[in-house]
Amino acid sequence: NDNEKMFNEIIVIASFNEKESLRSILKKISKKYKIVVIDDGSIDSTTKFLRSKKIEFISNKRNLGYEKSLIKVIQYVIKKYPNTKNLITFDADGEHKTTDLEAILKFCKSQNPNLLICNRKNIIRFSEKIVNFFFKLKFNIEDPLSGLKVYDLKILRKYIKEIKTRYFFVDLASNICRNNHKVLNFPIKCKIIKNRKARVGNSIFTNIKIL
């Protein structure tokens, strides 16, 4: 019974009409990892695929957006698997390399951070570069808008209720940094996804304002 198990880490993925890239990701991620997917009202039979692969998932009846979906699946994991040590957020579009996971978790095991932000070496969007510049200036930490992070579940449980949905990524990282928890970076190089729209960070000045 999964409910009674204690997982060292759980990977959560928010997906919206990304069945094919999700299929590729799930095929490559080691079966030793527990995965929970939230489907954000997809119309590409994502839930049918997940059910066929016996992947644990929850689904939205309508599209709520990336941040709301991520908050929802995080709260689901906190409630259902309270003894989990780390929660990993991982994007569904194929930008992140599954081969990085082993090195990331090895680093976490040795350094034991409360939050690990996997900073992208190849950020290409101007809006994200601006937010990154100001965040680094204030906290000496890079890339708060990265979708690949590792959270200490105890810390995440403490701050998740305080977070404004609209500014989820920056607000949560800022709160953890401000309270002198151990926050580290781990550099990664992402795949460049053509015609990929930014999930977050479109509103430059509102993100900067909350810093």
Per-range role (PLM):
Residues I13, N17-K31:
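Short, well-formed alpha-helical segments that are part of the catalytic scaffolds
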Residues D100-I117:
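Conserved donor-nucleotide/metal-binding helix-loop-beta segment in metal-dependent transferases, i.e.
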Residues I10-A14, S59:
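Short hydrophobic beta-strand elements that form part
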Residues N83-E95:
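Short beta-strand-to-loop acidic/aromatic patch adjacent to the donor-nucleotide binding site
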Residues K48-K80:
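Conserved donor nucleotide-binding strand/loop of the catalytic core
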Residues L70, N122-L211:
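Conserved catalytic loops of nucleotide-sugar-dependent glycosyltransferases that act on lipid-linked
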